[in-house]
Structure formats: structure tokens, C-alpha cells
């Protein structure tokens, strides 16, 4: 399901600092609105992430999590976050089996990520069958997607090779998260707020019904 990497360190860094470092080196990163006292920060790449990633402060350092049905943009952000944050806090990186990871980009190279994405897609199809075709709910960055037989048939991916089908599915999931339900507008009723680090309120991106 989810993949967790632990950054073992006694040092800490402010949320704003590590997000600015990630954004400055990698790509435009948008952080979901969280309370300053909240130990978990959830964020993704604007218009690209499907599920985003989570960084949680723990007693031993930091936990960096990526969830099932993440896409390539999520995985790329996850790898860069682990690399950048581990340098900022001088951390050693370990997987869930307490095995040390020397190079996250080597440990989770593009080929392995492709395998995980295809595996997740196949797993969702198995879960749908186990639920007799009834939709399964998976949360994206902003809203829940309901995935069932009707959707798979609607996307016309039933008979496609798994990798191709997974790519089409993730594009649909991306459209659901961003194109349809995210609008740039002031004075709206919002359930969740995103803002680019350093941007003013006028650049915020709002989710609303």
C-alpha cells in the first residue's frame, strides 16, 4: 500500500524552510493548509500530483510517506523531498525494514516506480472485483474518487496492457483533481486552501463545490 521512508536525526527544520528548498530545487510545490502545530505536512506539485506526499515529524526524525495509486509526479516529488530533507537535517535514511538507503534515486529508480504504479493499478482492479464491481473510494489531493467497473469501462481500458491502462487512469485521476474541481477565484466558499510558498493571497487556489 503506502511506502514509508524514515529520516533518522535529532535535528529539526521549519516547515517553511524545507518547502522553500524543495520548491527552489525541484518544481512549484503547493502545500495543503495545515495548522502550524500539526506534525504532518501534505503537499504536491501543482497540476501534476494525484495524491501528493506526507512528511511527518516523529521522535526519531521524520517520516516521508507516499500512498497507493500515486503517480510519477508524486514519486518524483517524494524522492526529491527525501533527498533534500535528509541533507537539511543531516539524517540517515531507512526503509520500513530498517535497512539503510544510501541513494533514494537508485533504490527507487524509474523502472521500479513504473512497476509500483502498474502493481497498484492491478491491485485496485482486484479490489473492485472483490467488491463485486462496487466503487472503491480513493482520495486525491482534494477530493475522493470513486473507482469501479463503470469507470474502467468508461475509460475503455479493460483490454489494454496494464502499463498503458494505468497511464490513462492516472490522467483521468489528474483531471479529476485539478481541471474540474480547482478554480482560481476570490471570495469563494472553500473547503481546502492551497497557496504557493511565498505567494500572496490573490494567487491562492481554492477547492469549492
Predicted features, each with a name:
Residues 9-31, 77-87:
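Amphipathic alpha-helical segments
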Residues 1-10, 61-65:
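Short glycine-/aliphatic-rich beta-strand segments at the starts of folded cytosolic domains
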Residues 1, 40, 86-89:
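A short, compositionally biased
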Residues 93-117:
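Short, highly charged C-terminal tails/helix-capping segments
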Residues 10-12, 67-73, 87, 186, ...:
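Short, flexible beta-strand-to-coil junctions
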Residues 23-74:
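Short, intrinsically disordered low-complexity segments
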Residues 108-209:
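Aromatic/basic-lined ligand-recognition segments
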Residues 31-34, 89-97:
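Conserved short beta-strand edge segments in small beta-sheet-based binding/regulatory domains
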